[in-house]
Structures are given as C-alpha cells and as structure tokens.
Design a protein with these regions (language model features):
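Periplasmic/cell-envelope proteins involved in peptidoglycan metabolism and beta-lactam response
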Residues: 1-305, 327-329, 347-349, 355, ...
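Beta-lactam-recognizing serine transpeptidase/beta-lactamase-like catalytic domain environment
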Residues: 4-13, 82, 231-241, 280-333, ...
Length: 659
C-alpha cells in the first residue's frame, strides 16, 4: 500500500515574525554602520579638518626659497669692482628625452663634453627624479651658447639655464681688499645655524670667504624671497600660487680709488711687498695692494686642486698672503714717533745734541752698535737725526726712554693693536715689552734689545696698514681716524603699494671717534713734522732723491730693515747673501705738508741694493703723482720750514706766480 504524502502547513505568522526580526536587525546594522561612517566623516571633515587640511597642503603646496641678488661693489668714483654676471649652463629633463644616452652623446660632440663626464652624468641621472632638470655643463662660453641655440630644436628636453655669478672685473688688482665668494661648505652652514641665519641662506649657493665680501656678508646678501607652488603627488610643480620677491643686498661704495690701485700694482711689479694709502682727514683707504696677488674669480666657481697647489707653491711667493696686513720690522720709519715720545717724556729737547762717531756703545759694554753711515754724522740734533736717519741718536734715545715708555706710547699710535679696519684678516703684529717677552719666551728683557727697538728692529713688527695709520695720527697731531674701506651703502626701497615709486637710500659711513693723543707740548708735533719735511725736501737728506722735482709739497721718512743677523765687525753686502736674507725697504710719506690729503706706507721685501729711499721711495712717489695729477701745492711761507735748501726756496719763487 502506498505511503501517504505529508502535508506541511506553513506558519505564516512565525515567518512574518522572523522576517520582521531579520529586517530589524539588518536595518539596525545599516543604521549603526551609517552612524559609524557619518561619525568618521564628521571627524575628518569637521573635528580634524584643520589637521588633515594642513597635512594635505604640506603634500600639495610647497614654499620654495628664492635667493636675493648680491649687492654690487664700487670704488669711490663709481667704477664697478664686484659684479653679478649671468652664467649659462646646459641642463636636461630626462623624461622628455627619448634615448638619453644617444642624445647626450650628440650634444657632447657639439659642445665637446668628454666621455668621462658623460658617464658620470648618466650615473647621476639614475639617482635623481626624471622630471627634474640636471646640469650637464656649467659655464658655457658665448660660442657654445650660440652653437647649441642654433641646434636646440634637435634636442628636446635639453635647454640652457642662466643664473648670476660673482665676477671681479679687475681680478688680482682688488682681491686682497674685496676678497671673494665661494660655495657654502659644512663649516659655513654650521656657523649660519648658530647665528640663526640658516633660513635666510636656504637658496644661496655662495658666501663671502675673505675681505669685504666676508666682512659685509650680511649687508651684501640681502633677504630671501619665497615662491608658493602647487605640486602633484610626484613632486612636479603644477602652478605658482604666490610670490614674495627677495630683497637684494645693499651696494657698497668704497674709499678705494681703482686708478691708484693700478699705479700701486705697476709700482710693485716684480717685487714682493705692499702699499697702503690713506686719507688722513677721515681714515678712508685710498689704495691697498699686496704683491704678488691672485685672481679671486678662481674661487667663485670652485678652484681645482691643481690651481690651488700652484698658489701654495714656494715659487709663487705666497700670493694668498695679504702683506698689507702682515708684520714687517718697521726700521727707521718709526724714528719720528720715538722722537715724539722723547720730547713728551722730557728726555730730549729740540736742541739736544749727541755726537755720532759711527757707532754707539753702552757704558761698560764692549759691543758697538753701528750707524748706517760708517764714519758717523758728527753732531746731531733732533732735526738732523730725522733728515739723516741717524741710528746713534735713536740708540741713545731708546736707552734713555726704556722699553716700557716706548711700548706704552707706541700702543697709543696703534702698534701691537688692531686698527679696526673692516677686514677680518688683519694682524696685530708685535709691539714688544717686558711683559710680552716674559709671556712669549719666559725670559727677561735686556737693554740691548731696547737699543734695537730704537731703530725699529728686535721683536718689533708693524703692518703697512698700522704704519700708515700711525703716520695719519702724526699729521693729525694726535687725532685718531680709524682706517676703513667702506664709504657708503646704497639700497633701493620699493613701495609695497606702488612699485614704480622706488626710493634709493644712501647711508654714509660714520667715522669712529677715538681718544686723541695729547702731548704735554703740542708744539712737539710741528718739530717732528718739520723734520720729516726736511727729509724729503732738503738736499742730501735720505728721502730727497725720491721726490726731487715734485709739484706738491711732500714729507716722509725712509727705512731699511735687517732680516738677517750680522756679526760684530761684519759688513752687509746684499750681493753676497741669499735673497730671503736681504734687507726690506720701507718708506712713509704724506702730502701736502700743510693740510695733508694722503699718507702712504710702502714695504718691499729683500731688495737687491739700496735702502728705503732708493727702493720704496719711488713707489710712494708714483702713487702721489697719480693722486695729485697736475696740481701744484707748495708752501709760499719759508718761515714754516726754515731749514730747507736753496733749491727748495728757488722752487717756491718759481711757482709763486702760479698761485
């Protein structure tokens, strides 16, 4: 018998309840998930909007630094000494070039790029983003720029970029004064960080390394600008959103006269030495030249090790050394200042006479110190001691003064101290004293050393700059003008509201005031200055030949500094000693005698023969001839200098009708 089918009766009520429950659970889940999603959206769009907006902008918007143009440098007459010139470089964007290796080879043939450099460039491209430009060749010549420009259509992705580089048109003529700029290194970066200036140099490649470029770095550099740009996720710039232009550095106008610099270079040609010329009225440096020199442009683009080694080679005679700021034995050029010291101390008077037999001997001492004139000068007073540069007179004066009084007064004239010039490379040189020797050598001071100091020898060294400053103090009768190279700064201020209304602001250099040297009798200045006048204007005086026939009324003092020890009784013969042991020639001069406009110090190393008058004197003469030109400046009042020769008085008569 067949089985009966089982009939299932559906419970519609239960199914409805189950469906309702499932629907409710599903709907509740959707609501919960929606609430969670809405909560997250609210958190992203509202609560954390600022945070994520900032993060987004940091990925999308970049602030790129823009370097300011470096300030220019001019001489006192507006001649450009330091310029910013465009330098052209060949660059490539790799992603825009098909078969970069082939194209690079073709460009290299056109511009003569070596295979070695090509390989280095290809290697460098592997580590850089393909959409960013890569420099292939720097400092393209005008001919190379022209060659590539004609064929540029053949090389898509290759282009020429121009940027400004420092350029010194007078090269070695101004290097020791201007210095130079060179690429910022690790030490520079650390210094900028410590000074809180790193941000202002974010886009700057070069920085002042020496001279005025270094001293006035912050003034010349200017203030960084910014370019706000939008970039994509690959770092490519899409558009510029905002631009804040950089503020250029200030221009410098110097006290230097480039024409005097040219004469200084010519006068020192073939010699090692230095010249410093100062305007005593304000301390402005008119000329400062050290020979040999070097071209600062070599360092701007990065000097090769081969060229740098050449500058350091012994036969190059140390061109990197600024001899104008380095120490030399002053020799007889300091005798006028010792005379001032003796007069002020009451050790001598204008009438004080000594007898010079050709040597000086301390009581009870066998050693004889010789005068430069073998048979001596006979009776010598203050004026004659300067005219004839009598060593015996100053041996005796130094002995009477003692090293302490000498050292104290010489420091007032700036010896052994920084002058304050706006150059970091300055040396203080050495002003010896009892304390100095004890600290340096742990030895006592000897009287014989004092005698050597009396003629500008022993441990005493001075820089040509110090010597010119001391002479400036002398002609100013105690007033001290700090030597300086900066005359004025110039900046262009642009009105934010109206860029067409730019204003040029010139700020003159303010001369620092220093405590003057006050003598017990101010007439002492005139006595010594008159002696210096005679030294140049009186026939037979040591400086007469150098300025014979000049149209201006000059004064000065010669000096010949020993660089080697000469034994007792031994004669000095320049032809018999090696060059490095020969005497140095020194000369100081100023003009005109009344109301001086220029003072000069000259140092020439290891001269073959003759002294300061024969070697350094003519160099000073060339500078002064250039400075005064055709001007005739000769005093018509012989009472101001009664000791002048008949030759000088005749000169006055001959020129009297021209004034």
């Amino acid at each position: 018998m067949a089985a009966k089918k089982r009939v299932v009766i559906r419970n519609h009520s239960a199914e409805a309840n189950l469906f309702a429950r499932r629907t409710f659970i599903t709907f509740a889940g959707i609501i919960i998930l929606s609430l969670v999603l809405f909560s997250n959206v609210y958190n992203l769009q509202v609560s954390s909007y600022q945070k994520y907006q900032t993060r987004s902008n940091s990925n999308r918007i970049k602030l790129l630094p823009v370097a300011p143009n470096r300030g220019l440098i001019y001489d006192r007459n507006g001649v450009l000494l330091a310029d910013n010139t465009p330098v052209y470089s060949l660059e490539v964007i790799p992603e825009q070039v098909n078969d970069i290796k082939k194209r690079l080879s073709e460009v290299s043939q056109l511009l003569d790029i070596s295979q070695e450099k090509q390989d280095k460039l290809l290697q460098a491209m592997k580590s850089k983003r393909r959409f960013k430009p890569i420099e292939l060749y720097s400092r393209l010549s005008d001919q190379q720029v022209a060659l590539f420009s004609v064929s540029q259509h053949k090389f898509p992705g290759f282009f020429i970029d121009a940027r400004l580089k420092r350029y010194y048109p007078f090269a070695e003529l101004t290097t020791h004064s201007l210095g130079y700029v060179a690429r910022i290194n690790g030490r520079d970066s650390l210094a900028l960080e410590q000074q809180g200036l790193a941000e202002n140099y974010a886009a700057t490649r070069n920085i002042g390394k020496r001279g005025l470029e270094r001293y006035y770095q912050d003034i010349l550099h200017g203030t960084i600008g910014h370019q706000e740009v939008e970039i994509n996720n690959q770092g490519r710039i899409i558009r510029t959103l905002d631009f804040t232009p950089p503020i250029p550095g200030k221009d410098l106008t110097l006290t230097l006269d480039i024409e005097l610099q040219m004469i200084a270079k010519r006068a020192l040609s073939g010699k090692r030495g230095a010249i410093v010329a100062i305007d005593p009225r304000d301390g402005g440096v008119l000329a400062m030249y050290s020979n040999p020199s070097f071209d600062g442009n070599l360092f701007v683009h990065g000097i090769s090790s081969k060229k740098y080694k050449k500058l350091l080679a012994p036969k190059s005679n140390k061109p990197l050394l600024n001899r104008a700021l380095q120490g030399y034995p002053p020799a007889s050029t300091i005798k006028p200042l010792l005379a001032i010291t003796g007069l002020d101390a009451g050790v001598i008077t204008p009438e004080t006479e000594i007898y010079d037999p050709g040597f000086y001997q301390l009581p009870g001492i066998e050693t004889k110190r010789r005068d430069w004139k073998k048979w001596g000068h006979g009776k010598v007073d203050l004026t004659k001691s300067l005219e004839q540069s009598c060593n015996v007179y100053y041996y005796d004066l130094a002995y009477k003064l003692g090293i302490t009084r000498i050292s104290q007064m010489m420091r007032k004239f700036g010896f052994g101290e920084y002058t304050g010039i706006d150059l970091h490379e300055e040396s203080r040189a050495i002003m010896p004293s009892i304390e100095w020797k004890r600290a340096r050598y742990n030895k006592p001071w000897y009287t014989g050393e004092t005698l050597s100091v009396g003629i500008g020898q022993s441990y005493w060294s001075v820089t040509p700059l110090q010597l010119s400053q001391a002479l400036s103090i002398l002609v100013n009768k105690g007033e001290i003008k700090v030597p300086h190279l900066l005359k004025a700064t110039t900046e262009v201020v642009i009105n934010d509201k109206d860029a067409s209304t730019a204003q040029t602001i010139v700020t003159e250099y303010v001369v620092d005031e220093k405590q003057p040297i006050i003598l017990k009798d101010q007439h002492s200045w005139d006595l010594v200055l008159d002696g210096l006048h005679n030294t140049v204007q009186k026939f037979g005086a040591t400086g007469y030949a150098a300025f014979k026939g000049s149209k201006y009324d000059a004064a000065g003092k010669t000096g010949s500094a020993q660089t080697a020890n000469i034994e007792q009784g031994e004669e000095y013969d320049a032809s018999q000693v090696k060059e490095s042991k020969r005497d140095n020639a020194m000369f100081i001069a100023f003009a005109p005698y009344e109301n001086p406009e220029i003072v000069i110090a000259v140092a020439i190393e290891n001269v073959a023969e003759g002294g300061g008058g024969a070697n350094a004197g003519p160099v000073a003469r060339q500078i002064m001839d250039q400075y005064f030109g055709d001007r005739e400046i000769i005093s018509k009042d012989p009472r101001k200098h009664p000791h002048h020769s008949n030759d000088f008085h005749q000169k006055i008569k001959n020129t009297a009708g021209n004034h």
